[in-house]
Amino acid sequence: MEALAAAGLMALYRPPAAPVAVVREVFEILAGACGVTFFVWVQHHAPVRMLARSANESLPARYVENLCTGRMLGGVAFAYLRRPGPPAVVATPVAGGYRIDGEAPWVTSWGLAALYAVAARMEDRVVFFLVDVEPPTPSLRASPPLRLAAMNASSTVRLSFDGLSVPEADVLSVVAFDEWQAEDRMATAKPNPAAFGIAAACIRLLGDTPLAAELDDCRARSYALADAGVTDDGHLAALVRARAQGLDLAVRAATALVTATGGRAMGLDHPAQRLLREAAFFTIQAQTPALRHATLAQLSRS
């Protein structure tokens, strides 16, 4: 993280944000080099992006400089909003702000990040707010780091909120839940550059392979769809299929690398097994029902 900060990469989304083509290239390079470093780093940008859009004008002055210089690492907790059933984390209005209760099942960078952007349901709305976790508070309780098949160094925990007090001054936004869902459907349908980065890393290690041309074609088609600026249901479905194709390609490229490497690939010090585990992780990261179905359909054809 210190090296990425020194390179200016903690400020990638500081207004004016870097061009989308540059962002994608950086994502691909970092994901191919080390998936867990990429994952911790990419979540850091969520608070920066949300601060840039927040109507709470006092918040950027408090946090943007430290986040964008890397003096403070950011994290995020909101994926549970996609889950059906009762809300995992709930906001209750109180005098001067909100009371937060519930459990976030996956919170990355615990012990590394100091500032988290968190979401909580409030009936048909979502409250997004910032939590500075330093110093510790009794109303936040983290589990021991979860043991994971991939991204094990990400220090991912379950985080319990027990009457956490969030003042209005720390609120980023309050939006309708269906509005957030519509925005999230589009965001999770877009191509994942990390999948292309993993595929590219595997292809470099493989050498001459037809997968290289397939990667070029898949990347070009996926990014063209994402840049088309169309939001109708048909285009959204095409985006989801393209994302699934990219995920499938990453898994196949990593499997090919393991196969070509042979028994040495089973050593934990060999990149082939790591790339395969990371490719598997990205097949479920930010997964929606539509993406799950599209990915399963794509895998059945491969």
Listing of model-derived features with the role each one plays in the protein:
Residues 1-101, 106-108:
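Glycine-rich flavin
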Residues 14, 215-269:
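C-terminal helix-coil-helix/basic helical segment that borders enzyme active sites and/or dimer interfaces
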Residues 24-28, 48, 196-204, 247, ...:
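Predominant activation on well-ordered alpha-helical scaffold segments within soluble catalytic domains
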Residues 26, 100-102, 161, 199, ...:
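Buried hydrophobic positions in well-ordered alpha/beta secondary-structure cores of metabolic enzymes
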Residues 72, 85, 112-114, 125, ...:
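A generic structural signal for well-ordered coil/turn residues at beta-strand boundaries
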Residues 103-135:
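DPxDG-like acidic metal-binding loop motif
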Residues 264-302:
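Glycine-rich phosphate/cofactor-binding loops in nucleotide/flavin-utilizing enzymes
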